[in-house]
Curated annotation (Swiss-Prot):
Pathway: Carbohydrate metabolism; tricarboxylic acid cycle; isocitrate from oxaloacetate: step 1/2. Pfam families: Citrate_synt (PF00285). Belongs to the citrate synthase family. NCBIfam families: PRK09569.1. Its main location: mitochondrion. It is found in: Mitochondrion matrix. One of its GO terms (cellular component) is mitochondrial matrix. Its EC number is 2.3.3.16. This is Probable citrate synthase, mitochondrial. GO terms for molecular function: citrate (Si)-synthase activity. Homodimer.
Length: 470
């Protein structure tokens, strides 16, 4: 790696050195922003009154599902293709983004660069960004988070602990400090938001590792010290206590494909909404994590694993040999119809937007096939993957009978010995910060205002459309 060129700049915390990789990142962002500013101006001037969608009464009562009313730059979800990160599909990202030496999986820090700048980083830029993140992993800030987490009751859910840990890091927010002292303004908010985003990305792996070791060993500490020779995902895995390179590859994949899923989901929209009030990135992301912790959002992967384990128990209880695919298919078909006929749903199948197999599911499945998984759980999901679309189509109560990413993610983690189900959403959140922080920074760069939609009451609607006083 070439020697870093540095320049002196003044931030909220005083003088600091700006690395060349930061200069390159900002340069790419400003270049893109200049073009987009002209595009936005032209769109609003010529087509500002064009309706993107209709907000019906039905939609207002049904979670605003299907209403297009947000601009969110990092990613776009296509019902057929799946997620596009800066207009690149997951297979395209896997092809062009830098990987670890002798590795096959995308480096999450390279994905972060893509989300933040819209450009594919060089291998050198990815390495330099990783070095920048290591430099920003301030032990004093991390110790503050450790103290806060250690003070929580032992029974605290890992996602609660993660949210608390992020709030503890907020004490060191450069965005908040600059705003409070009058050093920032509308033209510089984005730079302070970027500073906080990078600091948070640098420090949250240690926080997440502490939470894992608190769950498994009862101590809020990392299993191994941070290693500046390792990439972001490998270093995190090492701090968890996992030394196997294959697991590191698994984490690179997991953390790179969960980074974003456009701006309308609960965690992304919550983060965006809170940040629109000029709350700093830590406050905004902590709010997003609280949304991610909900059973209908990030906890879905736990629900899938519970379902799979219950299926595994039934198979064993009925004496079905998991190596006998024909017998396993008959048994799982029977169990599935019993589940559906009881009014329940199959966890991990269906999606609010997608109408095909989630490409993230395909990535995880292909990883298992490449690494020759022979687990009973993998054999189960293989058969479920084969039979479920047909069963759900015949059942007729879903628009999408195909699997989403949650249908597979827990199986990988179980395979490598990360079996603590309550912890899985922390991994999701650790990854998701990359996308939502890119969204926050770009909102500030584009000068996006406070989000403030209008609400109505049932009484008002009844008076207007039913002509009945209430």
């Amino acid at each position: 790696m070439r020697a870093a060129r540095c320049s002196i700049i003044r931030g909220a915390a005083g003088l600091r050195m700006a690395s060349s990789v930061m200069s390159e990142m900002k340069e790419q962002m400003l270049k893109r922003s200049k073009v987009e500013k002209q595009t936005i101006s032209e769109l609003r001037k010529k087509h500002g009154d064009v309706k993107l969608s209709d907000a019906s009464i039905d939609a207002a009562y049904c979670g605003m599902r299907g209403i297009t009313g947000l601009v969110y730059e990092p990613s776009l979800l296509d019902p057929v293709e799946g997620i596009r990160f800066r207009n690149r599909t997951i297979p395209e990202c896997q092809e062009v983004l830098p990987k670890a030496p002798n590795g096959c999986e995308t480096l999450p820090e390279a994905m972060f660069w893509l989300l933040m700048t819209g450009e594919v980083p060089t291998a050198e830029q990815a390495r330099a960004l990783n070095a920048e993140l290591h430099r920003r992993a301030d032990p004093v800030a991390i110790a503050a988070a450790q103290k806060a987490i250690a003070a929580l009751p032992a029974s605290t859910h890992p996602m609660t602990a993660f949210s608390v840990g992020v709030l503890a890091l907020q004490t060191y927010s450069k965005f908040a400090a600059a705003y409070a002292t009058g050093k920032s303004n509308k033209t510089t908010y984005w730079e302070y938001a970027l500073e906080d985003s990078l600091d948070m990305l640098a420090r949250t792996p240690a926080v997440a590792a502490m939470i894992y070791n608190r769950v498994t060993k009862g101590r809020a500490e990392v299993a191994a010290s941070s290693n500046s020779e390792l990439d972001w995902a490998a270093n995190f895995s090492n701090m968890l206590g996992f030394k196997d390179n294959e697991f590191w590859e698994c984490m690179r994949l997991y953390l790179s494909i969960h980074v974003d899923h456009e701006g309308g989901n609960v965690s992304a929209h919550t983060t965006t909404l809170v940040a629109s009030a000029l709350s700093d990135p830590y406050l905004a992301f902590s709010a997003g994590l609280n949304g991610l912790a909900g059973p209908l959002h990030g906890l879905a992967n736990q629900e899938v694993l519970k379902y799979l384990l219950s299926m595994q128990d039934r198979v064993k209880a009925d004496g079905v040999n998991v190596c006998d695919e024909a017998a396993l298919e008959v048994a799982l078909t029977k169990y599935t119809w019993e589940l559906l006929n009881s009014g329940q749903v199959v966890p991990g199948y269906g999606h609010a937007v997608l109408r095909k197999v989630d490409p993230r599911y395909t990535c995880l499945r292909n990883f298992c096939l490449r690494h020759h998984f022979e687990d009973d759980l993998f054999k189960l999901i293989n058969i479920i993957y084969k039979i479920m679309p047909g069963i759900l189509t015949e059942h007729g109560k879903t628009k999408n009978p195909y699997p989403n990413v949650d249908a597979h993610s827990g199986v990988l983690l179980q395979h490598y010995g990360l079996t603590e189900q309550d912890y899985y959403t922390v991994l999701f959140g650790l990854s998701r910060q990359m996308g939502v922080m890119a969204g926050v920074v770009w909102d500030r760069l584009q000068g996006r205002p406070l989000e403030r939609p209008k609400s109505i009451t049932t009484e008002m609607l009844a008076k207007k459309y039913l002509c009945t006083p209430r």
